[in-house]
Every structure is written in structure tokens, then in C-alpha cells.
Swiss-Prot record:
Task of the protein: In the hair cortex, hair keratin intermediate filaments are embedded in an interfilamentous matrix, consisting of hair keratin-associated protein (KRTAP), which are essential for the formation of a rigid and resistant hair shaft through their extensive disulfide bond cross-linking with abundant cysteine residues of hair keratins. The matrix proteins include the high-sulfur and high-glycine-tyrosine keratins.
UniProt lineage: Eukaryota, Metazoa, Chordata, Craniata, Vertebrata
Signal peptide, first to last residue: none
Alphabetized UniProt keyword annotations: Keratin, Repeat
Quaternary assembly: Interacts with hair keratins.
Sequence repeats: 35-38, 41-44, 47-50, 91-94, 150-153, 160-163, 170-173, 189-192, 199-202, 218-221, 228-231
Name of protein: Keratin-associated protein 5-3
Originating gene: KRTAP5-3
Family the UniProt entry places it in: Belongs to the KRTAP type 5 family.
Region span, 11 X 4 AA repeats of C-C-X-P: 35-231
Tissue expression summary: Restricted to hair root, not detected in any other tissues.
GO cellular component: cytosol; intermediate filament
């Protein structure tokens, strides 16, 4: 069809020219400033998906104003702040973990399958649709927690999203249950030195150890006990 006011002629596959598409409803975009590009006008516009722009045809894996293979073109972002969401029902990517959004705090969108990056859920996948953080411990703190930063102070709830617990049993990979020996998987998983004689650091030494201690970083300020936590750093001389 003809495209008046544009450079060149438009073929039969042209959706329209420039801003003179007409008939575009809410949530639909036009051709922008370009003319005579294939199937350009009156298509759903995807908002606020990263790594896309509509500055030129094909930059989003398709024509301007069309959701391409990269997730779509940036359109009117609305309240999403240039990241995700804000498109309403015409978005090309899921923006919420639940169909009604609600607890996700984002814009309504298509729920799709669980897991993947949807509206802030992260890449490790949610254990339930209402989850907004990367993962949650279902119960307790140990191996059921995907990563150390996904737990609340008290990990009894099914929805937990904060760092290590304040209790002796914390959400990091491991903790010493009692003593310091092999019950502690690694030094990085323990709380700072306990106030008790048995602490969670790799080792502690009693007074008089001095230079005979393997590593100064493994010792507590001198304590009254003669035994120190693993690994044994020194033969204490009293």
C-alpha cells in the first residue's frame, strides 16, 4: 500500500509508515520514526526487558514494535524503572512468580513455569509461586537452603530470605554443633569465636602459646583452657 510522506514505496508486507499506523489499541506500538519496514505497526510492544532497543529494525530479533527472540523491544516502561514489568498483559516475558502478581510486588504478567528469572525470583528457581528471592529453605537451615543468603533469622518459616540466623544453628553451609572438631565442615561456615571454651573458629590457643602457634589467625585471645580448637595449633607451655 502507499505510504505518503515517506521515502520510497511500501510493499504489500508493510504494516504502515511512521506514526500514521492508526487503529492501534492500548498496549500496541507503531513504527516509530522509520517507514516501510516489514510488519511494523500495531503489534504488542514489550516493555522494560533488558538488552533490547528499538533504535533500528532487527535489533530485537524482529521488526520495530514486535517481540523478538531476545524478549522484546523497550517500549513504555511505566513504573518498572527500566528493568522488567510494566507491560500489563502484552508483555513477552513473565514478570511475576504468581499469576496475580500480588506478593511479588511487580506488574501483572504471565506466570509460566516455575524457575528461571521471573520478576526478581532469580535463577535458582522458587520453591513456591509466591517466592520473590532466589530460593528458600523449606524447613531448618542446613542443606535444604540453596544458598547462604536465602534464609530469614528464624528458618522455621517456609518463606525465608535473609542471611545467617542468629541462633547457634545458622543458615550457612555448616556450623559446629558442639566442640570444634570435624563437626565443623569448614572455617568459613562458622560464627565468630564462641564465648564458651569450645568455639567455632578453626582453632584456639591457651595462654603461653606465642610463636609456637601454627597460625596467629587461628587463635582466640588467650583463654584459660589448655586445649585449643582444631586444627591443633600448638603445644601449650604453661
Amino acid at each position: 500500500m502507499g505510504c505518503s510522506g515517506c521515502s520510497g514505496g511500501c510493499g504489500s508486507s508493510c504494516g504502515g509508515c511512521g506514526s500514521s499506523c492508526g487503529g492501534c489499541g492500548s498496549g500496541y506500538g507503531g513504527c516509530g520514526s522509520g517507514c516501510c519496514v516489514p510488519v511494523c505497526c500495531c503489534k504488542p510492544v514489550c516493555c522494560c526487558v533488558p538488552a533490547c532497543s528499538c533504535s533500528s529494525c532487527g535489533s530485537c530479533g524482529g521488526s520495530k514494535g514486535v517481540c523478538g527472540s531476545c524478549g522484546g523491544c523497550k517500549g513504555g516502561c511505566g513504573s518498572c524503572g527500566g528493568s522488567k514489568g510494566g507491560c500489563g498483559s502484552s508483555c513477552c516475558v513473565p514478570v511475576c512468580c504468581s499469576s496475580s502478581c500480588g506478593s511479588c510486588g511487580g506488574s501483572k504478567g504471565v506466570c509460566g513455569f516455575r524457575g528461571g528469572s521471573k520478576g526478581g525470583c532469580g535463577s535458582c528457581g522458587c520453591s513456591q509461586c509466591s517466592c520473590y528471592k532466589p530460593c528458600c529453605c523449606s524447613s531448618g537451615c542446613g542443606s535444604s537452603c540453596c544458598q547462604s543468603s536465602c534464609c530469614k533469622p528464624s528458618c522455621s518459616q517456609s518463606s525465608c530470605c535473609k542471611p545467617c540466623c542468629s541462633q547457634s544453628s545458622c543458615c550457612k553451609p555448616c556450623c559446629c554443633s558442639s566442640g570444634c572438631g570435624s563437626s565443623c565442615c569448614q572455617s568459613s561456615c562458622c560464627k565468630p569465636c564462641c564465648s564458651q571454651s569450645s568455639c567455632c573458629k578453626p582453632c584456639c590457643c591457651s595462654s603461653g602459646c606465642g610463636s609456637s602457634c601454627c597460625q596467629s589467625s587461628c587463635c582466640k585471645p588467650c583463654s584459660s583452657q589448655s586445649s585449643c580448637c582444631v586444627p591443633i595449633c600448638c603445644q601449650c607451655k604453661i
